[in-house]
Amino acid sequence: PYESSDVPDEGYPDGLILKCAVKELKKLKAQKKPFFLGVGFFKPHLPFNAPKKYWDLYDRSLIPIASDPFIPKNVHPNSVGKMGEFYNYKLSDEKPTLDQSVSDVYARKLIHGYYASVSYIDHLIGELLLELKSLELDKETIVVLWGDHGWHLGNDRKWGKHSLFERSLKSALI
């Protein structure tokens, strides 16, 4: 569920989404009237695919792993949920399960992919904000950022989003 290719930002769908959004912003500015533009990026959803330069921002050996890689006591297994996202991938690596934690090496690989995906999107959002400024739209534009769910990175022996734990249910709104 991860990939690092030495390609430009447009080598993955989110880079193409940014390119389309910039094109649309230019059209909307030319109309000289109020507008709404929704820009939806995929990352950091699985698969954790991002250009290599974002993976290179992190030294995998220094990436911390979850300090709580176990199912909490007195929690019914059904409330933990499944990890279906990971089972949709044909992995040559380990598959996380609720019965057994993944190795530290594999955990770091997955977390590394998540970090790279977040950094990729952070950069693309920054580029979009710079474009708003260069088009002189930044002073009269409201920007709202939100995520649709949280994410387990080995915490509570979970990988993914499907659980009733706060880590999954909590989402960002900026």
Set out the residue ranges of the language-model regions.
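Active-site-proximal cap/lid insertion segments
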Residues: P1-L16, E24-K33, G38-E140, V144-I174
